[in-house]
Swiss-Prot record:
Native organism: Photorhabdus laumondii subsp. laumondii (strain DSM 15139 / CIP 105565 / TT01)
Domain of life from the UniProt record: Bacteria
The UniProt record lists the keyword Secreted: no
Swiss-Prot/TrEMBL keywords: Gluconeogenesis, Glycolysis, Isomerase
EC number: 5.4.2.11
Descriptive protein name: 2,3-bisphosphoglycerate-dependent phosphoglycerate mutase
Positions bound to substrate: 10-17, 23-24, 62, 89-92, 100, 116-117, 185-186
Catalytic reactions on record: (2R)-2-phosphoglycerate = (2R)-3-phosphoglycerate
Underlying gene: gpmA
Length: 250
């Protein structure tokens, strides 16, 4: 049976991850730790013998720079890369820029968990005159007005991620190309939910650690056979737990 592999990687720690702030579509750089995490991810992929044919990422530099660091480690800087806003992090609306722990202290841990992890629950909207509204950003100049979010849930994130997977990425994987996707916690949760046919309740508890390669193996019909992280299991579990705890009051 022919097996095709796909690698998913959440970006390394960003400056706002480090500061425990809601980020969303805000274009925040990797922290020094995040760059090191991305390089380590590249080393793991190199040690496992991964060689890629194509890469996808978002239009946000924390994901782009994670991909750059990975490709540097596997010596494939020349690899063709397609960037799409459809792989962006979920838009966190008016929460973008706020401290997660302070927000939890104000509204309660349960409310913040619902905003962060609830399937169809959206954070408070931005207004379109807010400087954080993506309509003011030139990288989104070609988007239709209805494509510019003022907030998003995981459900609405799925509505942009899955068509992009089905129409753009999946055909490459299906023809045997080795693809890597460097994206974000929620755009990857959207894809994982779809690939694994996860329930809304199960996805609520799924936390994707920063910069740990997640490998999916597919059969000839593009059905997932199995998936697994590369790296030390205890370290990966600790990273996932840290992600889960970000939205709690101190």
């Amino acid at each position: 049976m022919a097996v095709t592999k796909l690698v998913l990687v959440r970006h390394g720690e960003s400056e706002w991850n480090r500061e425990n702030r809601f980020t969303g579509w805000t274009d925040v750089a990797l922290s020094e730790k995040g760059r090191a995490e991305a390089q380590q991810a590249g080393q793991l992929l190199k040690e496992e013998g991964f060689v890629f044919d194509f890469a996808y990422t978002s239009v946000l530099k924390r994901a782009i720079h994670t991909l750059w660091n990975i490709l540097d480690q596997v010596d494939q800087q020349w690899l063709p890369v397609e960037k799409s806003w459809k792989l962006n992090e979920r838009h966190y609306g008016a929460l973008q820029g706020l401290d997660k722990a302070e927000t939890a202290a104000k509204y309660g841990d349960d409310q913040v968990k619902l905003w962060r992890r609830g399937f169809a629950i959206t954070p408070p909207d931005l207004t379109k005159d807010d400087e954080r509204f993506p309509g003011h950003d030139p990288r989104y100049a070609n988007l239709k007005p209805e494509e510019l979010p003022v907030t998003e849930s995981l459900a609405t994130t799925i509505e942009r991620v899955i068509p992009y997977w089905e129409e753009v990425i999946k055909p490459r994987v299906a023809q045997g190309e080795k693809v890597i996707i460097a994206a974000h916690g929620n755009s990857l949760r959207a894809l994982v939910k779809y690939l694994d046919n996860m329930s809304e309740e199960t996805i609520l508890e799924l936390n994707i650690p920063t910069a740990v390669p997640l490998v999916y193996e597919f059969d000839e019909n593009m059905k997932p056979i199995k998936h697994y992280y590369l790296g030390n299991a205890d370290e990966i579990a600790a990273k996932a737990a840290a992600v889960a705890n970000q939205g709690k009051a101190k």
